[in-house]
Amino acid sequence: MPLSIIHFPHPTLRHVSRPIVRVDAKLKSMADEMLDLMYEFDGVGLAANQVDLPIRMFVANPTGKRDEGESWVILNPEIDRPKGNDTAQEGCLSVPGLYGQVKRPKTVRLRGFDLQGNEINQVLDGFMARVVQHEVDHLDGIMFFDRIGEEGLRDLEGHLEEFKTDYESKQGTGSIADEATLAQQRAEWEAMYTGGTTSNG
């Protein structure tokens, strides 16, 4: 079944993703699908849990264009060594149309691996640093509007309620599975790629 972008308040968006311990052809294919979706919807980054995969992987390209810049696929990312502060507008493909001003470190170090197992250890600044922090937040179950403060959140509350109503409607009609089924699906993905057991939700 092809991957698709899930929308708030789907529970996988709040799930803390586990590190990947296995890379196979299917995982590489899913990374390609994630890049396709990111470019299709004019994004600059997409985390695995945004396509209902509870694994620590994200894709990114700060240009948002397939034929420009570099397409990144990062496994098991970690960020540290934050420096400086910068505030800028962010949006999210899982809450399309919503934006907020988010304060983040201006410079961070990214560590992780690519699909070939090569280690990544790179200091990033500016927009790419912001993109990476946004995606790693996703993998930790954090969305950008969790970081915008009470005043900014008040501006979005009505729109977030609309997303909740739409989600509940789709779950009611069966186009989105119930919570128990979604938890089981996450556990199966974790067992396949993170060494988790199918008893974990």
From Swiss-Prot:
EC number of this enzyme: 3.5.1.88
GO MF term list: metal ion binding; peptide deformylase activity
Required co-factors: Fe(2+)
GO biological process, one term: co-translational protein modification
Keywords of the record: Hydrolase, Iron, Metal-binding, Protein biosynthesis
Catalytic activity of the protein: N-terminal N-formyl-L-methionyl-[peptide] + H2O = N-terminal L-methionyl-[peptide] + formate
Name of the protein described by the UniProt record: Peptide deformylase
Organism: Rhodopirellula baltica (strain DSM 10527 / NCIMB 13988 / SH1)
